[in-house]
From Swiss-Prot:
Segments in the Periplasmic topological domain: 36-88, 144-152, 228-257
Source organism: Vibrio vulnificus (strain YJ016)
Chain coiled-coil ranges: none
A biological process from GO: maltodextrin transmembrane transport
Signal peptide (from-to): none
Cytoplasmic side, ranges: 1-12, 112-123, 176-204, 281-296
Gene Ontology cellular component terms for the protein in this record: plasma membrane
Keywords linked to the UniProt accession: Cell inner membrane, Cell membrane, Membrane, Sugar transport, Transmembrane, Transmembrane helix, Transport
InterPro entries assigned to the protein according to its UniProt record, in alphabetical order: BP-dep_ABC_trans_perm, MetI-like, MetI-like_sf
PROSITE patterns for the chain: ABC_TM1 (PS50928)
Protein name per UniProt: Maltose/maltodextrin transport system permease protein MalG
Length: 296
């Protein structure tokens, strides 16, 4: 019996390993293909995983350098990719910081304070968050068109307006941080109050330091969401130099002009900010994700 169980366990371990490798292959293979396309000559979507004649022409164009062709002609960069990348980092960074600030203070109110209608407001926030932003595109355009007449830096074709529009999607983050706050014992804040701390001091000096993991998670999720967001950004931004990278990359794929190599190089560049932010905050990520869903 022991031998049978040992063989059965061995087969299950092998089956698990095979399934994991298959899953990893499904994730890694598209990434390798994108990298390979960015190093191929010409703008072709098909070809071998390892280019026959690797070329840096697409990367030079993406980084803003002109390329001299074999016939002596010069190809200038078709689009300001680095400007788009900076716009993405700027919008995503500011939006994520503001989302963390608003979500944290709102979650504290829902987790610690008692007021009439608290549960109703929480449920309403979650219900409204379930509707995709695409349903509100017409309303958003009309709203920011009107808002720009009174506050120009929050109107159409402004990064301020785009950031402001993203702040409406904090309901899920409020719920996540609220769940984390509820795992922290109230006695810590009560002890701080006995030592003479005001509610704001207890929140800032006691609760926030203990909440760094979940705040890092919210920042990362917000950053990733904004960097890859297209519908709202493409609606509110009309100037090419104001585009975020996710919106600008669509310029490479017009029906009469599929620049797959340039598109692939820009796609790899778009992953760099997300990767850097993730690496800087990864030590808090696992703990924040697991604790954020626990209610004490």
């Amino acid at each position: 019996m022991a031998m049978v169980q040992g063989k059965s366990l061995k087969y299950r371990v092998w089956a698990t390993h095979i399934a994991l490798w298959a899953f990893l292959s499904m994730i890694i293979f598209p990434l390798l293909m994108i990298v390979a396309i960015s190093f191929r000559e010409g703008n072709f979507a098909t070809g071998s995983l390892i280019p026959d004649n690797p070329s840096l022409e697409h990367w030079k164009l993406a980084l803003g350098f002109s390329v001299t062709n074999a016939d002596g002609s010069v190809t200038p960069p078709p689009f300001p990719v680095l400007t788009w990348l900076w716009n993405s980092v700027k919008v995503a960074g500011i939006t994520s910081i503001l989302i963390v600030a608003l979500s944290t203070t709102s979650a504290y109110a829902f987790a610690r304070l008692r007021f009439k209608g608290k549960e109703t407001i929480l449920k309403a926030m979650m219900i409204f968050q379930m509707f995709p932003a695409v349903l509100a595109l017409v309303a958003l355009y009309a709203l920011f068109d009107k808002l720009g007449q009174y506050i120009p830096f929050l109107g159409l074709n402004t990064h301020g307006g785009l950031i402001f529009s993203y702040l409406g999607g904090i309901a899920l983050h409020v719920w996540t941080i609220k769940g984390y706050f509820e795992t922290i014992d109230n006695s810590l804040e009560e002890a701080a109050a006995l030592d003479g701390a005001t509610p704001w001091q207890a929140f800032r000096l006691v609760l926030l330091p203990l909440s760094v993991p979940i705040l890092a998670v919210v920042f990362i999720l917000s950053f990733i969401g904004v960097v890859g967001e297209v519908p709202v950004a493409s609606l509110l931004l009309s100037d090419v130099n104001s585009y975020t990278l996710a919106v600008g990359m669509q310029q490479y794929l017009y029906p009469q002009n599929y620049l797959w190599g340039d598109f692939a190089a820009a796609a790899v560049l778009s992953a760099l900010p997300i990767t850097i932010v993730f690496l800087l905050a990864q030590r808090w990520l696992v703990g924040g994700l697991t604790a954020g869903g626990v209610k004490g």
